[in-house]
Regions:
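Gly/Pro-rich cap/lid or specificity-loop segments adjacent to the active site
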Residues: 2-223, 336-341, 354-361, 367, ...
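Alpha/beta-hydrolase fold active-site neighborhood
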Residues: 218-350
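Short, proline-enriched alpha-helix->beta-strand connector loops that line the catalytic pocket
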Residues: 230, 363-369, 391-392
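Short alpha-helix in the alpha/beta-hydrolase fold that links the catalytic acid
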Residues: 251-253, 381-390
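Hydrophobic alpha-helical segments
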Residues: 372, 378-379, 391-392
Length: 393
């Protein structure tokens, strides 16, 4: 059944399709999940035989954009393509994976379930959509951030499906090594924090006052979670986006309602920014995207790197922020992540990863690939991206 409707300048068609939860086991053994497939097309060209462009959303754990109107990259793409948005398994309108689904499992079973939501399964889902709904027509892909990781997995598994690949800020190191990623990205986060303090010098003292108050240990968010200094530091993930510096500055401005008392507006905003309500898989799967047989366990690589850097200590002033880095404390302190705790710890210890990249196949790649690398990317290190692109691909 197709659900069709119109947005300003866009004709939308939605369909749902079942896929195996575990592609290696098949439907009978593991059951199925549902994917939401949303197709966008220029209303004036709805009957035209347009080429297909599959958008690969950033993440991990990110669902596709919900357009309000025809603008941005979608406007440009609709000039030439029929755009296909497949909500990745576990996200958006596809069968969700939430903490409650994992909390009742033992740690090993929970880790196995999480691992079924990595890039290899996502690519198999996309191939099923392409074969089933589009008659096996080849398509181009546009990958944003983590979507670039998916792109290289796709080129490793099914390059024959692809006419061209476009990537924005998302070429992984190959083979992926979590420790190497964080050794580089902590430097970028430190630089972004320093840049914020240069732009807003009064925030050095204002943020120190917030951290000092949180260090007393009795500040609760509206949902009852205790707001710790390290959870406040994690808001630095926004420094990797524009206008992240400005957003964080304006958040800090409204921190105190009275001397010593943090405002309800500030606490509500911090909860919204750090609760993972909209995307619990982002932190849960964060390090698993670097899991590879050549690299061994990810072993909480971000926490290990942070422990090597006293400048990020909660007691240091000026206070440093952290970025796109998952830490074990999140699964104790953040209410909506607690159900994942045992499973994500088991996942961090996993060594027998399914490989996501076929380096020989990538070296022989003949699918056109164009990548935009952001020179000061805080989350996907530009140096690692360029090293991968410099290799035969």
């Amino acid at each position: 059944m197709t659900n069709e409707y119109h947005l300003p300048g866009i004709r939308v068609a939605e369909r749902r399709i079942e896929v195996p939860l575990d592609w290696s086991a098949g439907t009978a053994a593991a059951g199925t999940i549902e994917l939401l497939v949303r197709e966008l097309v220029d209303p004036d060209r709805a009957r035209d035989e347009l080429p297909l462009l599959a958008f690969l959303q950033g993440g991990p754990g990110g669902s596709n954009p919900r357009p309000l109107r025809r603008d941005g990259w979608i406007d440009e793409a609709l000039r030439d393509y029929r755009v296909v948005l497949v909500d990745q398994r576990g996200t958006g309108g596809s069968t969700p994976l939430e903490a409650v689904d994992v909390a009742g499992l033992d740690a090993a079973a929970g880790a196995d379930l999480l691992a079924l939501h990595r890039a290899d399964s996502i690519v198999r889902d996309l191939e099923h959509v392409r074969e089933t709904l589009y008659g096996g027509r080849r398509w181009a892909t546009l990958g944003q951030s983590y979507g670039g990781f998916l792109t290289l997995t796709y080129l490793s598994m099914a390059p024959e499906a692809l006419t061209a690949c476009y990537v924005c800020g998302g070429i992984p190191g190959t083979p992926p090594r979590a420790a190497e990623v964080y050794a580089r990205t902590f430097d970028r986060v430190a630089a972004k924090t320093a840049e914020m303090y240069r732009r807003f010098p009064a925030d050095v003292e204002a943020i120190a006052r917030i951290a000092d108050r949180l260090a007393e240990g009795d500040v609760a968010l509206p949902d009852g979670d205790v707001l710790t200094v390290r959870r406040f530091q994690s808001l630095g993930i926004d420094l990797g986006m524009k206008p992240g510096h400005e957003r964080l500055h304006w958040l800090v401005e409204k921190a105190f309602a009275r001397p010593g008392r943090l405002s309800e507006a500030f606490l509500a905003d911090v909860q919204s920014l750090s609760s993972s309500a909209g995307n619990p898989l982002f932190w849960t799967l964060q390090e698993s995207i670097y899991g590879d047989p050549a690299s061994g366990p990810t072993a909480w690589a971000a926490q290990t790197e942070r422990d090597r850097r006293p400048v990020f200590d909660e007691s240091r002033r000026p206070l440093m922020f952290t970025g796109e880095m998952a830490f074990p404390w999140m699964f104790d302190e953040v209410r909506l992540l607690r159900g994942f705790r045992d499973a994500v710890h088991a996942l961090a210890e996993r060594a027998d990863w399914t490989p996501l990249y076929d380096l020989d196949r990538l070296a022989a790649n003949d699918v056109p690939l164009a990548a935009a690398v952001y020179f000061d990317d805080m989350d996907v290190d530009a140096g690692l991206q360029l090293e991968t692109l410099a290799a035969p691909l």
